[in-house]
């Protein structure tokens, strides 16, 4: 049975796959993207192009005002983006305080307003060590709170919560997805740097699946 759902869609390969997984399940999808002052704002342009191509309703919400309250992340502040392998210590600087709770809260409110039954987002096991708001216990509790906080219960789904980026890409390949339509790099340049932790994890996923990454690198 088709349901209306909201997908938090950044434009990266994880949320791109989540978007198409929700569509493949037969859902009516509403895509929701956020500008929170991230350096890699190029991902929002990529997300818009994909939604336009597929006729998916797409809202981009500017929440950059929250940066007057939040600090300390290399994704939004004047702090160097870490290079090298996707390791816990080096990547902790990319944590935006309370980001997913903020984004999920807004997405849940949007879902209630649109009479949607669920919110999907792209948490996966590769993020568990680095991002507390991608861990199973967080997702479970957000699902509970979301169903309590409104008269209309909205479920929180993270379809790839228990698998890594390699498996996400494998599922996308099965669906025939074109990953040239995604952006992963944390640096906001014309081409992906290939050096930041996000690029490294992406490249490892393509190597593990035995295919070449279709995007251009510096």
UniProtKB/Swiss-Prot annotation:
The keyword Zinc applies. Its cofactor is Zn(2+). It holds the Pfam family QueC. SUPFAM superfamilies: Adenine nucleotide alpha hydrolases-like. Binds 1 zinc ion per subunit. It comes from the Bacteria. Keywords: ATP-binding, Ligase, Metal-binding, Nucleotide-binding, Queuosine biosynthesis, Zinc. One of its GO terms (biological process) is queuosine biosynthetic process. Zn(2+) binds at residues 185, 193, 196, 199. Catalyzes the ATP-dependent conversion of 7-carboxy-7-deazaguanine (CDG) to 7-cyano-7-deazaguanine (preQ(0)). NCBIfam families: 7-cyano-7-deazaguanine synthase QueC. This is 7-cyano-7-deazaguanine synthase. It comes from Idiomarina loihiensis (strain ATCC BAA-735 / DSM 15497 / L2-TR). The lineage of its organism: Bacteria, Pseudomonadati, Pseudomonadota, Gammaproteobacteria, Alteromonadales.
């Amino acid at each position: 049975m088709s349901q209306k759902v909201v997908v938090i869609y950044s434009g990266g390969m994880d949320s791109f796959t989540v978007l198409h997984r929700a569509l493949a399940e037969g859902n009516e999808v509403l895509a929701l993207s956020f500008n929170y002052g991230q350096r890699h704002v190029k991902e929002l342009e990529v997300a818009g192009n994909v939604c336009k191509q597929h006729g998916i309703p797409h809202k981009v919400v500017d929440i950059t005002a929250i940066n007057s309250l939040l600090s300390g992340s290399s994704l939004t502040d004047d702090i160097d983006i870490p290079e090298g392998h996707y390791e816990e210590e080096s990547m902790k600087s990319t944590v935006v305080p309370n980001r997913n709770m903020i984004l999920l809260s807004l997405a849940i409110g949007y879902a209630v307003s649109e009479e949607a039954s669920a919110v999907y987002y792209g948490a996966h096991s590769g993020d568990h060590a680095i991002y507390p708001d991608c861990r199973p216990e967080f997702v479970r509790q957000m699902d509970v709170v979301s169903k309590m906080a409104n008269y209309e219960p909205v479920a929180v789904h993270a379809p790839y919560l228990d698998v890594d980026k390699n498996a996400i890409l494998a599922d996308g390949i099965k669906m025939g997805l074109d990953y040239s339509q995604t952006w992963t790099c944390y640096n906001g340049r014309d081409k992906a740097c290939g050096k930041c932790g996000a690029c490294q994890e992406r490249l490892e996923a393509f190597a593990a699946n035995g295919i070449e990454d279709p995007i251009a690198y510096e």
